[in-house]
Structures are given as C-alpha cells and as structure tokens.
Amino acid sequence: MWFNSVKDTKMKKNLKKWVLLLVAAIALPVTTMAQEKKVELGVNLDVTMDVVSSYIWRGQKLGNACLQTTVGVAYKGFSLSAWSPIVFDGNDNDEIDLTLAYETGNFSVSLTDYWMTEIGDEHTLEAQLGYDFGVVGVNWYTNVYGDDKEYASYISLIAPFSLIGLDWEAEVGATPWGTDYYGTDKFSVCDLSLGASKEFNIGSWFSTTLFAKATYNPTAEKFYGTVGISF
C-alpha cells in the first residue's frame, strides 16, 4: 500500500511537470511572436526553456544535464511563475517551484514554494527581499515554512557588467548562520560565481541566449562549470 501510494504520488507529480512543459512548448512561439507588440491590458506572458549541462543552485549541485522550464505571467509589478527541471538521465528530484512576486522601482519581494516529494515535507516556503543598487543587487532569502526548522537563510550579492561584447554577472552567496539545509555550521560563503551570456537574434521575432558559468563553493571546496542555451 505504501509503495503504491508513493508511486501514485510520483506519477501525479511527473504528470504535472510534463503538463508544464507542454504549456511552455505551446506558449513559447506565441510569446516570441508577441514580443514587439505589448498586450493592451498590460498582462505579459513569459515562457523560457533552458537546456543546461548541470543543475547548480547556490553553490550546490542538485542534478545533471536537464531542461529547465519557466512559465510566468506578470501584471503591474506582480508576477506568478512556475519553474521545473526535467533531468535527462532520469534521476529526477520531482521539483516544481511556484513563485509569487512583486517589484516596484528597485525593490522586490517574493514568496517561493519549493515543492519536492522526496525531501521531508513536500513544501518549503521561502521569503525573499531584495534591492537593486545598480552596480550590485542584494537579496535575502529565509525559509519560513516546511521541513527546515532552522529558518535557513541565504544572502546573495550580484554585480552585472558588460565586457568584450558579453553580459557578465559576478555573484557572492553566503549563509548567515549554520544550517543543515545548506550544509553549513556557521556563517559561510558557499557560492562564488562568474557567468557570461550572449544573446543572438534570429529574425525579428525570435532570440536565443548562450551562457556559461563557473561556480566555486569554498565551504564544500567544490568547483562546478555549467554551459547552456536559453530559448
């Protein structure tokens, strides 16, 4: 009975992920053709599909090569999006991230539901506060609900710049206190990253972006390299 219950749950979760992918596949050509013509009501539909060589998140490797799909809708600063990876080697962690966000000026706030069936509680809610100072963007994240009882937090500083025709991002990420969620026992820098990207326009209605990123986790003493393409 327990095995059947787990199997049914995973089947339902996988179905939801494939439905998300199908919606993205259908909506992608619609959104690309409508990029030059804004919807009069001010509602914007955003669909992206990234193929990446590995799934790296905040200095941790969570998976191998995968397709990462995002479907979102935005209206007057508010946005709602769904994100999910489909790992090519079949070692899927059954993840769907649902994010409700609001942006005004340089300030942003959001609440993300990390929905994973294989890690304790299926849902972990994370609150985010951020401010973009121009030369650097600062974001603070804290788990406010779920299996994590330590209010695991993470702070990220991202500095964007342009050089030799590429768009770059330098990032520093750290945990302000120890938590099993990030595998740290004190204040720890766990993400030193440098990424570059280049957008290519194909005609007047479609564009794609190639990107690469190098990540070093000083706490775990691990290095990761990622390349990918975004549609």
What are these regions (language model features)?
Residues 194, 200, 218-231:
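Outer-membrane beta-barrel "beta-signal"
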